[in-house]
Design a protein with these regions (language model features):
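Conserved hydrophobic/aromatic pocket- or pore-lining residues that grip, position, or stack substrates
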Residues: 7, 25, 38
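Single conserved hydrophobic/aromatic residue that forms the stacking wall/gate
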Residues: 1-12
């Protein structure tokens, strides 16, 4: 029994190592299991440093049985935002806001511009409290802190564009109508 157990443990470890799904230093995510930076890959388990700086020891079978997202190997980072504008925003304002956001992204050196990389600034839906514009674009950087900086700059630019067009962001609200009884 011991030989079979050791053999299966080695098989799982070898699968983790041979498939090269990740290596020491990689930022990985396994849904419902772990997210963090790989510190070591051992015989039976892998040690991952979580983003709260705690260490987690994960049995290797978890990596063999689950999808592993290796964020270190990403080529770009995606921004996928829903921008909610008030219902009083006119069609003309919506067109201008969408165009100016798209123009900003196309002119900025921070974003990927290629035929095979999606850039979309489109009205997505008429939500309960807003007209929603979905923005999807990809940054050139894959580094987390740089990505946060690009998002911050983009958010401020979008706010400027919305204000310049004399529109406002929506917030969840409820309208109450009271009927008069005659």
């Amino acid at each position: 029994i011991y030989d079979r157990l050791v053999g299966s443990e080695m098989c799982i470890r070898d699968r983790v190592l041979v498939e090269r799904r990740f290596q020491v230093g990689d930022w990985i995510y396994v849904e419902g299991v772990i997210e963090g930076t790989v510190e070591s890959i051992g015989f039976r388990s892998t040690v991952v440093r979580r983003f709260d700086k705690s260490l987690a020891t994960i049995p290797n079978f978890q990596f063999a049985e689950n999808a592993v997202i290796n964020n270190t190997q990403t080529t770009n980072r995606r921004i996928n935002w829903m921008i909610g504008l008030e219902y009083r925003t006119t069609s003309e304002q919506l067109k201008n806001i969408k165009k100016e956001i798209e123009d900003y992204i196309k002119k900025s050196d921070d974003f990927v511009k290629s035929e095979d990389t999606l850039l979309s600034v489109k009205i997505d839906q008429f939500a309960a409290s807003s007209i929603d514009i979905r923005l999807i674009c990809f940054t050139k950087t894959k580094h987390f802190q740089e990505w946060l900086n690009v998002k911050d700059t983009l958010a401020l630019e979008i706010k400027n564009i919305v204000e310049k067009n004399k529109a406002s962001f929506a917030f969840p609200s409820t309208s109450v109508y009271v009927e008069k009884n005659s």
